[in-house]
Amino acid sequence: MSITAERKAALIKEYATAEGDTGSPEVQVAILTERINNLTEHFKDHKKDNHSRRGLLTMVSSRRSLLDYLKKKDEGRYSKLINSLGIRR
């Protein structure tokens, strides 16, 4: 369910705006998207796992808030991010 350290480092490297950047909205959204996709796969086999489903909803809400913030601050970065991650909006 969780992402590996290598995958997380790759996401940070790909979406970071500067060297060592782990807190930018782009990086946070990319990591949340990876975790959401992993949990979505988990639910295909474990339909009754409601405890994890609540965590998924929390992650989706957090990602939505970060995306709203990014859209408000810089529409170009927002558009580029949702296109590269394949998030529909």
From Swiss-Prot:
The entry lists its GO molecular-function terms as:
rRNA binding; structural constituent of ribosome
InterPro entries reported in the protein's UniProt record? Ribosomal_uS15, Ribosomal_uS15_bac-type, uS15_NS1_RNA-bd_sf
Q: Name one Pfam family in it.
A: Ribosomal_S15
What CDD domains does this protein's entry cite?
Ribosomal_S15p_S13e
Arranged from A to Z, the UniProt key words for this protein are: Ribonucleoprotein, Ribosomal protein, RNA-binding, rRNA-binding
Gene Ontology terms describing biological process: translation
Q: Gene3D superfamilies from the xrefs?
A: 6.10.250.3130, S15/NS1, RNA-binding
Q: Name one GO cellular component term.
A: cytosolic small ribosomal subunit
**What is its quaternary makeup?**
Part of the 30S ribosomal subunit. Forms a bridge to the 50S subunit in the 70S ribosome, contacting the 23S rRNA.
Q: Any idea what job this protein has?
A: One of the primary rRNA binding proteins, it binds directly to 16S rRNA where it helps nucleate assembly of the platform of the 30S subunit by binding and bridging several RNA helices of the 16S rRNA.
Q: Which family does it belong to?
A: Belongs to the universal ribosomal protein uS15 family.
- HAMAP family per UniProt: Ribosomal_uS15_B
Name of the protein in its database record: Small ribosomal subunit protein uS15
